Amino acid sequence: MARKKVRPRLIAELARRVRALREQRNQPRDSQLYALDYETLTRPHSGRRLPVRAWADVRRESRLLQLLARLPLFGLGRLVTRKSWLWQHDEPCYWRLTRVRPDYTAQNLDHGRAWGILTFKGKSEDTAREIEQVMYHDWRLVPKHEEEAFTAFTAKPEDRLNSVPYPPLLRAMILAERQKNGDTSVQEPLLNLERTRMRPWDYPAKQETKGRAKGTPV
């Protein structure tokens, strides 16, 4: 007997999608989540107060969307960086904007999300991704006439330290051992820092015990 074909529950699926859309609409927007009372330095939505270290930056610096709202096309293709990056790193650190989605319910369009390609300490990523911490008050726009000088960077060759001199006592012991064995080489003894994988002294015994426990395959 052929099995009866079960039709999908179209009404239940439609109801699930409607509930998901309602939940999405009821979620607070960025302009509500990250709204800030500049007198008390608290966020009205959560009631949390900003940390003391952020108070000075809130009054002097700007959020990312505050900068982009003043530019045509919200600054697509421009470079933005952060004050903390300028202080901490000598290498160029910046985002190149590829996409901006402002929150159109915000009064000055100064909230939203942005995407870009990150270059951190002179190394650029291959793909664009969403920019994090856009609500922080430490974003700065790189002027167009300074972009070429800001992005100029020559990577320095990495100096890998493969060996170091032995401590004085060990060095004296090695030289004495050479003299005892009749070795006349004058090469300075150096300690190799490269990792070499060495098997433990009981490795063969462990392998033999493991083979016995496993038994012979049938």
UniProtKB/Swiss-Prot annotation:
Q: Give the CC-aspect GO terms.
A: mitochondrial inner membrane; mitochondrial small ribosomal subunit; mitochondrion
Its assembly, as annotated, is:
Component of the mitochondrial ribosome small subunit (28S) which comprises a 12S rRNA and about 30 distinct proteins.
Q: Which InterPro entries match?
A: Ribosomal_mS34 (IPR032053)
One Gene Ontology molecular-function label: structural constituent of ribosome
Biological process terms in GO annotation: mitochondrial translation
Q: Which UniProt keywords apply?
A: Mitochondrion, Ribonucleoprotein, Ribosomal protein
Transmembrane stretches, by residue range?
none
Q: Does the keyword Ribosomal protein apply?
A: yes
Q: What does this protein do?
A: Required for mitochondrial translation, plays a role in maintaining the stability of the small ribosomal subunit and the 12S rRNA that are required for mitoribosome formation.
Query: Can you tell me which family this protein belongs to?
Result: Belongs to the mitochondrion-specific ribosomal protein mS34 family.
- Where does it localize? Mitochondrion
Pfam families from the UniProt entry? MRP-S34
Q: What is the lineage of its organism?
A: Eukaryota, Metazoa, Chordata, Craniata, Vertebrata
Q: What protein name does the entry list? A: Small ribosomal subunit protein mS34
Q: Quote the tissue specificity entry.
A: Widely expressed (at protein liver).
